[in-house]
């Protein structure tokens, strides 16, 4: 059974393997053992209540409960930008007009922004290519909503998610090549690595402070503003089905879109509910895939099961109960996947 659980120190080797498969552009999952070890330690200190809000971040892994193999990672930052500034570009408009000359130009413009400061962030979503089947992607992404619903007071009103922008297999980013490289004088992969390993001071020091007309960028760069990496398109679709929207904010490095949603309007959070569990054999039937999660903060587990989403008493097998770290009589959180998400 595939389950979501909190990260552990022993996961470092598995995370290094996952980081080596990202193909670049996933800033928060660098192939750097010291950085990943520090990320794990920060997550564990978050669970133990040792960190201030601005440093808190949860990390989860997707595990095969029978073999112990890890095939994915996802994370939540509790509040971005409270320690280091959290930058993006807002895609807006500047109008230049002259009645005398009968000229009117509305020009798309990039404005440096810290507008999402304090928001909770969904981040570090990566699923091993060999695991991209049987609904694992839905489980990996949406399990975070089950955790947020259970422990709502630990998160802020707005949730954001930066989507990976367009980058080729060689690490070439049209947006970076046309804009960022002119100010940072380094390749995208180098800037991405520095940011991913926590060396972010250079961003504030070198970022252009004035608005930038997108017409000054190459046509190739203009075309990828707000667009996602092909491998990220499914993740974007999953979030959009949950209520997330692109509000014209983009990543300063690759131009990928930032999606956002008020936390209480996220579908899985809004519609999830608590039901009692019982041990037994689930009744036969063509039931939809549902997310099921326990309410145990320190030993959180989430999985996909086929069940009646309207039930008030969820019957699970002994193996399922064990994987979810719960027992008969406990209450678990239940919500079905979106109706069109049937590939489980």
Swiss-Prot record:
NCBIfam families in alphabetical order: arg_catab_AOST (TIGR03243), arg_catab_AstA (TIGR03244), PRK10456.1 (NF007770)
Pathway: Amino-acid degradation; L-arginine degradation via AST pathway; L-glutamate and succinate from L-arginine: step 1/5
Reactions performed catalytically: succinyl-CoA + L-arginine = N(2)-succinyl-L-arginine + CoA + H(+)
Active-site residue numbers: 229 (proton donor)
Domain of life: Bacteria
Induction: By nitrogen and carbon starvation, and arginine, via the ArgR and Crp transcriptional regulators.
EC number: 2.3.1.109
Keywords per UniProt: Acyltransferase, Arginine metabolism, Transferase
Classification of source organism: Bacteria, Pseudomonadati, Pseudomonadota, Gammaproteobacteria, Enterobacterales
Paired cysteines (S-S): none
Keyword ATP-binding: no
Protein name: Arginine N-succinyltransferase
Function: Catalyzes the transfer of succinyl-CoA to arginine to produce N(2)-succinylarginine.
One Gene Ontology term from the biological process aspect of the record: arginine catabolic process to succinate
Binding site for succinyl-CoA: 125
Family designation: Belongs to the arginine N-succinyltransferase family.
Pfam families, per database record: AstA
Organism: Salmonella typhimurium (strain LT2 / SGSC1412 / ATCC 700720)
Molecular function in Gene Ontology: arginine N-succinyltransferase activity; N-succinylarginine dihydrolase activity
